[in-house]
Amino acid sequence: SGKGGRGLMAQAVELNGKKILVTFLMHLGDLTLTTPFIHALRKAAPDAHITFLADEKLKDVVLHNPYLDEVITIDKKGKDNSLLALMACARRLSKMDFDVLINLHPNERCSFIDAFTKVKLRCGTTHTMFKPLWDVFTPLNRKIHAADMYLDVLTQLGVKKLEHNGLEIFPSEEY
């Protein structure tokens, strides 16, 4: 199809020096598989401010990641498990004035929040119903390993060199 919402797929996006919001509200194993993406994003955009939206119950997977500047959480199965709560989350995120939003998974909850968050550039993947709102849509290649699939989003956004150390876990100082 070639078209994805308001923009084209595989469009180079300026990431360095930008306020970037990465959204991912999936399960523990899936979240761990985003760590190469986070590292590669930081290497590609060393001067960016990178914020990550994750599920409250899984925040420890990303909380101490040195490649992130900030982690924001929602309690997706608890207090934030309603459309009103998701809209409130989108309003909170909108006030943070992000330049670029990158969604890594097309689940409905994350796609809904992303669709209603005011940002300058919305990219990555999304649920089909929200695709017309995306500036740069990056389809997920489900024929490759999930960690590589998330890295491929950066390739589609024009990142030429994907530097990372594979899967990484950064425990708190207590460990």
Go through the PLM ranges and name each one:
Residues 1-175:
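Catalytic machinery of carbohydrate-active enzymes
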